[in-house]
Amino acid sequence: MNKRIININDIIPNEEYGIIRRNKRREMIEFKKFRRLDVGPVASLYFESRETMIYQIQEMAYVEKITKQELNEELKSYNPLVPDGRELTATMMIEIDDPLRRKNFLSRLGGVEEKVKIVIGSHQIYAESEKDIDRTTREGKTSAVHFLHFKFNNELVEAFKNKNNMIQIGIDHEEYGHLSIISDKVREELAKEFI
């Protein structure tokens, strides 16, 4: 069982959160600084943690003024994105401002969620997407947002932590092939998710 699961007691009541909200936002901006990686010109991966998920839930609860019962339902949706100690989880966003260009681009990117990978030496770890809803339609159009899991074994965790190994994150879709090298700062930050 994932000991990092978020429960209702981890969420501050809205009245209290409103007082500290501005400071929490500043803290989270700093915390996320080395958790984002651009892969090509329009795709970005935002690597999640227990802290980022609590912040997102807290913000949603505050803005939408949801009830405790609704909050319990939201926890069921958010908890699968908390890394379990042997994985990295990420929200991948395809960010194109122009709506027409975005629609056209996404219509050619079906199945992209199955083509995202972390490369460590000769090892490739392909993402597994959240199964909550299909992110690609039968017509081949994909969503602009994907929730991804990269599963690691002990050997891959050690390889990830080893600073002598170059780590790349890529997408090898036929319509969008890009590879990015992660910095030592990003590696160091993401390695905190492994227990």
Regions found by a protein language model. Give the residues of each.
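Long, contiguous binding/interaction regions
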Residues: 1-87, 95-195
